[in-house]
Amino acid sequence: MPVDSKLIRNFSIIAHIDHGKSTLADRILDATGALTAREQKEQFLDKMDIERERGITIKAQTVRLDYTAKDGQTYRLHLIDTPGHVDFNYEVSRSLQACEGALLVVDATQGVEAQTLANVFLALDNNLAILPVLNKIDLPSADIERTTREIEDVIGLDCSGAIPASAKTGIGIAEILEAVVERIPAPKGDPNAAPRALIFDSWYDSYRGAVVMVRVVDGIIRKGQKVRFMATGRDYEVTEMGVFTPHATAITELGPGEVGFLVGNIKSVVDTKIGDTVTDAVHPATTPLPGFKEVKPMVFAGIFPTDSAQYEDLRDALSKLHMNDAAFVFEPDTSEALGFGFRCGFLGLLHMEIIQERLEREYNLDLITTAPSVVYHCYLNDGSMKSIENPAKLPPPNLTDRIEEPIFRMTVHVPSTYVGAVLALCQERRGEQKSIQYASSDRVIITYDMPLSEVLFDFHDKLKSVSRGYASMDYELVGYRADDLIKLDMLVNGDPLDALSVIVHRDKAYARGRDLAVKLKDIVPRQQYEVAIQAAIGSKVIARTTVKAMRKDVTAKCYGGDISRKRKLLEKQKEGKKRMKMVGSVEIPQEAFLAILKID
């Protein structure tokens, strides 16, 4: 029998990076006796090595805990750990939809930061009860009063019931568990209605196929039942069900409010879309759960093997990652400069870095990644629209009416001392100021609309350096906007290098072209003839550098004698060089591309 839903509490933990979310989850597991002493390790829920090293959570993890409260009742707590990074925003919103409450963890030494705010607003959108927890109070620099004031001013939450805690030393953990039971509402749901369950995570298991994490809202899902995924319309038989306690434990049914996993010979996670509704195949629910949307990649880059013999290995590795991560897409791509490879789409820069690192680390591949680009909307003169992911595929200017680029709403939290530097940086990146708000006397929230292409390269690094590491940022897509965008080509000896084509704003094209030309000059090997390196917009060259020719001293054997003799030899050499230049093609080593793409 499913447990009485009055005794269930579903909650997640939301926090900015490094505010102590995973450590708090560890302490909660310890306090409820979920782990034996042998299993207790740092960041138990962060399963991937990369998660542990970077101290971030990428995939949401879920644990069922049984907790006996002070009132003598045993409650079933479901802790749903969410990723905190903005790239995984949609995953966070679905994980939060599976909960009724959230612990808002704020580092008492740092105060409210940008991603805390973004995730809190997601939680408020889903009508969750929010319990503020002030973490790290064991540190001498913790300022509880200032932090509570900031939460009240910036987020507008009542902090009279905020719980001071230290996940490291275990202070306040018992109070947090009691507050979860008392202040987070029990799930509502009709056990007799047609089953509806929300998919909030899925991953691929090489033996069982896709494993789907669900939160049941209405009805009961049983082992052996035929279920339908409403977004794809596909039917599967539930061959296995279970919960994590935190180890996988088999069960036979899930009732309203419960969280668990389903297995049903599902071939790929592409069929298990996050936010989709699972219902009964024979008597399906009439309406799916609200809020589902397809996740679209925002950032594209080419990934090429440095050794072309690794092409098949790269294809296999990408297929395996795609099975586990439906938001990551790829298709074959060829480049004249880099050979065969793949054009890959990611949710954002962090997502791209993680995929690249996993390819190199888990599959031992040696890769070149081209400069990341965003998806541009190119409107042609006939009124049709093309999505351009690869700058080399942009139609010629005489056919295009306008090009639109994605605009992101940036929210930057910064100490007031550095406001000037941050504003200057945002202006320089073609930002449009929306608002400036003082969270407290020394913390400012700046909002800007900015093209994603300007954020991509090194905006985050620059922001950290102008604010001495104190600024934090968050962003969300607000739409597309037309601007004066053009394609910049790099030519070596008159031949375009497709791997270095970029779409830039006209005002920045000259500086960008000059920089690339100067960098290429140091990298292109010297030939027997002069090599021209040019940056061009269409047929107009805007910057040029020249790699000087290597030449033999043809006059070395002339001792004295008439000048015309020497001139004749030099003219003959010049003719030969000219002929070579007409037929010669410059081989550019892959290291050259690596060096340039790294500089970007």
Curated annotation (Swiss-Prot):
Q: Which EC class is this protein assigned?
A: hydrolase
| Highest taxon in the source lineage | Bacteria
Spell out the PROSITE patterns in the cross-references.
G_TR_1, G_TR_2
SUPFAM superfamilies tied to this protein: EF-G C-terminal domain-like, P-loop containing nucleoside triphosphate hydrolases
**Which Pfam family, giving just one, matches this sequence?**
GTP_EFTU
| Localization per record | Cell inner membrane
Cite a GO CC annotation.
Answer: plasma membrane
Q: Which GO terms describe its molecular function?
A: GTP binding; GTPase activity; ribosome binding; translation elongation factor activity
Q: How is this protein positioned relative to the membrane?
A: Peripheral membrane protein
Q: Which GO terms describe its biological process?
A: positive regulation of translation
CDD domains found in the cross-reference section: EF4_II, EF4_III, LepA, lepA_C
Q: Which reaction does it catalyse?
A: GTP + H2O = GDP + phosphate + H(+)
Q: Does the keyword GTP-binding apply?
A: yes
Task: List the Gene3D superfamilies hit by this protein, alphabetically.
Answer: 3.30.70.240, Elongation factor 4, C-terminal domain, Elongation Factor G (Translational Gtpase), domain 3, P-loop containing nucleotide triphosphate hydrolases, Translation factors
EC annotation from Swiss-Prot or TrEMBL: 3.6.5.n1
Q: What keywords would UniProt list here?
A: Cell inner membrane, Cell membrane, GTP-binding, Hydrolase, Membrane, Nucleotide-binding, Protein biosynthesis
Q: What residue stretches are annotated with the tr-type G domain? A: 6-188
Q: Which residues cross the membrane?
A: none
Which residues of the sequence carry a binding annotation for GTP?
Answer: D18, H19, G20, K21, S22, T23, N135, K136, I137, D138
Role played: Required for accurate and efficient protein synthesis under certain stress conditions. May act as a fidelity factor of the translation reaction, by catalyzing a one-codon backward translocation of tRNAs on improperly translocated ribosomes. Back-translocation proceeds from a post-translocation (POST) complex to a pre-translocation (PRE) complex, thus giving elongation factor G a second chance to translocate the tRNAs correctly. Binds to ribosomes in a GTP-dependent manner.
Q: Which family does it belong to?
A: Belongs to the TRAFAC class translation factor GTPase superfamily. Classic translation factor GTPase family. LepA subfamily.
- Write the protein's name: Elongation factor 4
Q: What is the scientific name of the source organism?
A: Sorangium cellulosum (strain So ce56) (Polyangium cellulosum (strain So ce56))
Q: What is the primary gene name for this protein?
A: lepA
